Amino acid sequence: MTKREKGGFAMTAIQFATNSLPFHLFQDYMNLTVTFLKYSNNYENQKDNFLIQYAREDDNYYAVQLIKALEIGPSGLLKSIFTDYWNYMCQFGIAENTEHYFGGLCMNGNELIEKYRNQDGSRNEFVYKLVMAYVEWKGYEMNQKSVVAA
């Protein structure tokens, strides 16, 4: 990974963490990520559709950066989180039963936040915000106390 590529990913990570990335783009990116992890043979079509969708909008710059972040694969955090999350949900069966599924999201949110704590033991805010955004993306409202112990 070149310096420029690393810089592009770092910028994307900062945008996720500071919520400066347009949320509808984040939603679409999560869909694209699932496609990437589950159906890599269909990824090219999804990627093209994603870029075309934002080609005439102010969001195009963000869209291109997100694609780069996904394709390059960061040397650590974001790819690890997505892979862990997706593997967990596959084991869980991605149940149709909403309550069952909701339980999976809660447990896995805790697991990810625990796994990626800072060295001093404090919560990693980037991971926390990413998990919460993923849960919001899935359309579930939850009390933060039931998901994460501060």
Residue ranges and their predicted role:
Residues 3-5:
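Extended amphipathic alpha-helical elements
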Residues 7-68, 82-89, 147:
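Short terminal alpha-helical segments
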Residues 16, 20-27, 72, 76, ...:
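Short, solvent-exposed segments of well-ordered alpha helices
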Residues 22, 26, 78, 82-85, ...:
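Short runs of predominantly hydrophobic/aromatic residues within well-ordered alpha helices
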Residues 30, 34-37, 67, 71, ...:
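Residue-level detector of alpha-helical secondary structure
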Residues 54-75, 126-146:
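Repeat-associated, polar segments at repeat-unit boundaries in modular proteins
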Residues 75-96:
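Amphipathic, heptad-repeat alpha-helical segments
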Residues 101-150:
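Amphipathic alpha-helical binding modules
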